[in-house]
């Protein structure tokens, strides 16, 4: 291999050349915008722990989507704040539930918008856990039919992609079988395959009113110390029928994103989660970082190997990319 002075790495770093040789690129098409749909409010409600982010009333969700489409953001993931909760999360699969109504409302106005729906029970249960609880334990197998039923109700409402996030063993298989049996063989599953029991979720739990009433989620979400375990989780999801795999969170787990990219050929999503968002926004508001840090964060996730990024920064970064 040639050396200096024959090789001068700075030759390709001239201002009018740099863009030609960028190995990772970011565009609005790569971004998925989260929307918190709340059927209990009539006006947008600021989320205290997520600066500049809001809960959106059901009646205004189509307007929120329209604003994003004007910025070339075409893909959305919906999280619901329902009007009622119970022990088993039955409002998750209610055909008149908040997500079901939101999907129908959006699709009626914007049929080409890509709607991903979060399939989990934590927002719909009184205890705030992601599965059925018996004697203080989250019961895996009894949860599976409920999340299967929930996924079908989302597909019936018009969801383009369903995204199970509860980290129940066998959840992808249960959803794939339920969708196929209901005639939705072509509905893709984006699995939260490697979802870590992270401290970076706290603002989301405020936003979605999904905080747990007892214990924690370390019995079903992944241990933050483990990397090889993530490969096992993803391999199982692939075998069960996942079409898209995901790593969550993103920034503290760039090593996992890279490992997944090198081992699996499926489309890979990464979730730039609420704590990552709030951390960066707080630093910007205090003058400790410039807004350019947002782009650097997102391009680092892309560079690590993610095809898609779920991010609360989508609208502000899309404006800069236009």
Curated annotation (Swiss-Prot):
5-aminolevulinate 2 binds at residues 274, 312. InterPro entries: ALAD (IPR001731), ALAD_AS (IPR030656), Aldolase_TIM (IPR013785). The active site is at 195 (schiff-base intermediate with substrate), 248 (schiff-base intermediate with substrate). One of its GO terms (cellular component) is cytosol. Its cofactor is Zn(2+). Pathway: Porphyrin-containing compound metabolism; protoporphyrin-IX biosynthesis; coproporphyrinogen-III from 5-aminolevulinate: step 1/4. GO terms for molecular function: porphobilinogen synthase activity; zinc ion binding. Zn(2+) binds at residues 120, 122, 130. The keyword Zinc applies. It is an enzyme of class 4 (lyase). The keyword Metal-binding applies. Keywords: Heme biosynthesis, Lyase, Magnesium, Metal-binding, Porphyrin biosynthesis, Zinc. Its EC number is 4.2.1.24. It catalyses: 2 5-aminolevulinate = porphobilinogen + 2 H2O + H(+). 5-aminolevulinate 1 binds at residues 205, 217. SUPFAM superfamilies: Aldolase (SSF51569). Mg(2+) binds at residue 233. It holds the Pfam family ALAD. NCBIfam families: PRK09283.1 (NF006762). Catalyzes an early step in the biosynthesis of tetrapyrroles. Binds two molecules of 5-aminolevulinate per subunit, each at a distinct site, and catalyzes their condensation to form porphobilinogen. Belongs to the ALAD family. This is Delta-aminolevulinic acid dehydratase. It comes from Archaeoglobus fulgidus (strain ATCC 49558 / DSM 4304 / JCM 9628 / NBRC 100126 / VC-16). The gene is hemB.
